[in-house]
């Protein structure tokens, strides 16, 4: 008797499945097709994205080679092209390198590029600080001390990545401006920071020695 009931149950299930298929089968097929298309489209995008990244990497290395060979004009043009059309990560790297090449012939124009990068919040604070530091390094020999302070003092806070370099540049700018008080302030800050790199510490000690020699002369 139980076999009869089982056969009836199976027949009912088959009939239900048949009705469901007749009603919704076309939608199931469409969903499967869309899934296949979506997966295929994603795979195509991944392939295309990897291809573009590889091309940008090759172009970046070629531009670096031009710079190494002293072909600065060609390197500048290559970095500018990549900064305009490369993948997002290489665009940023290329923009920094473009500014470095521009600085060889036109420091003012290079500062403008670095200022643009420093103002771009999409880069994140570390890269923004790096751009601001690079601009300050270009200007340290020519700009008034007050301008260097305005640019670099925010970078000297204990939580900033490039604080040691920023403090060093400010100490140098103060020395050039013959502002002994400011130079001592930044020098003391550098020497008191236990995380100051030994190279930076040595440079400041040399700067202090030069300042002492200036006093005696």
Locate the predicted segments by residue.
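Soluble extracytoplasmic domains of inner/organellar membrane proteins
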Residues: 89-217
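Transmembrane signal-anchor/signal-peptide helices with a preference for the extracytoplasmic
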Residues: 38-60
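Flexible helix-coil transition and linker loops at the boundaries of alpha-helical arrays
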Residues: 47-48, 83-85, 119-122
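N-terminal positive-inside, membrane-proximal cytosolic segments immediately preceding the first
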Residues: 1-34, 55
């Amino acid at each position: 008797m139980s076999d009869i009931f089982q056969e009836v149950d199976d027949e009912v299930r088959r009939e239900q499945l048949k009705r469901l298929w007749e009603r919704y089968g076309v939608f199931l097929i469409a969903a499967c097709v869309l899934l296949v298309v979506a997966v295929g489209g994603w795979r195509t995008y991944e392939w295309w994205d990897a291809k573009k990244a590889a091309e940008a990497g090759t172009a970046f290395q070629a531009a670096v080679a031009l710079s190494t060979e002293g072909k600065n004009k060609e390197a500048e043009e290559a970095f500018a092209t990549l900064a305009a059309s490369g993948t997002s990560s290489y665009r940023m790297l290329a923009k920094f390198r473009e500014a470095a090449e521009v600085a060889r012939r036109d420091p003012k124009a290079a500062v403008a590029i670095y200022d643009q990068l420093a103002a771009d919040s999409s880069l994140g604070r570390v890269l923004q600080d790096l751009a601001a530091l690079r601009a300050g390094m270009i200007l340290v020999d020519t700009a008034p001390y007050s301008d260097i302070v305005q640019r670099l003092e925010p970078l000297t806070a204990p939580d900033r990545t490039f604080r040691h370099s920023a403090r060093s540049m400010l100490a140098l700018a103060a020395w050039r401006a013959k502002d002994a008080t400011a130079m001592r302030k930044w020098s003391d800050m550098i020497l008191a920071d236990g995380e100051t790199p030994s190279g930076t510490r040595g440079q400041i000690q040399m700067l202090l020695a030069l300042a002492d020699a200036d006093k005696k002369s």
